[in-house]
Amino acid sequence: MTVPDPARPAASPSARPRVLVANDDGIFAPGIKALGLALSEWADVVVVAPDVEQSAVGHGITIRRPLRFKHTAAAGFGDIPAYRVDGTPADCVVLGVHLLGRPDLVVSGINIGPNLGEDLTHSGTVAAAIEGLTLGLPSIAFSQFANEAGEYDFGPSAAYASRLAREVCCRGLPPRVLLNVNFPRVSPRGVRVTEVGLHRWEDSVVTRQDPEGRDYHWVAGVSTAHDGHDEQTDYGAVQAGFISVSPVRLDLTARDLIGELTQALPPL
């Protein structure tokens, strides 16, 4: 699959494909609205998103309580069918596929903030794409840095995301591979196909007291390590001003260690 050049129109599909759009920022987030509207120019789009923000929930699935799946006309999607779910991003994809029919593509985002390196392990945005992949559907996750003023302009990112999604609909993706796409904080210099790099967080816990003297805790994190100087990685590419497109394979086996580990295992 070829990543489209920003100056070259994408190939036209023979019929309007069906695209399921999800996110982790919630149904009212500006990124999913911009993405859904951009995709609707060439696809039949349906939006299924959490009713409240679900950032950093990872690939959680709700199994201990029922889920509510409600149509909403208040999220600003115009004629695009939009549904809110009181669950996780992965729940949204599961319900969207099973209740509304299998789409041709699952798209997640555009996330408020990047998802780079180890972020992929706890990102609800990426988890929605992973859930699409586990259901046998080509899937893409989109995330974006804020600009230097701390603001988000999703219009240009949504336009490129739409073109990339259309290319994937035309060409497909290899089995068990999704695309994780990150937009830089500046006007992009171009597009880079990248490796998932290093973006390590040091977890910290802030403890405070409520008015009754009881402790409560905030779990936070500080970015402590990254490979921002290596433009072949996702973090390095966006730091250099490029759109990062990382092919991510859903294969957790360290195959290069199977032989060595087999020899090292103690006998039963």
From Swiss-Prot:
Name of the top EC class for this enzyme: hydrolase
Origin superkingdom: Bacteria
Cofactor note: Binds 1 divalent metal cation per subunit.
Short name of one Pfam family: SurE
Catalysed reactions, semicolon-separated: a ribonucleoside 5'-phosphate + H2O = a ribonucleoside + phosphate
Binding site for a divalent metal cation: 24-25, 55, 111
Entry's Gene Ontology molecular function annotations: 3'-nucleotidase activity; 5'-nucleotidase activity; exopolyphosphatase activity; metal ion binding; nucleotide binding
Xref: InterPro entries: SurE, SurE-like_Pase/nucleotidase, SurE-like_sf
Name of the protein in its database record: 5'-nucleotidase SurE
Originating organism: Deinococcus radiodurans (strain ATCC 13939 / DSM 20539 / JCM 16871 / CCUG 27074 / LMG 4051 / NBRC 15346 / NCIMB 9279 / VKM B-1422 / R1)
Phylogenetic classification of the source organism: Bacteria, Thermotogati, Deinococcota, Deinococci, Deinococcales
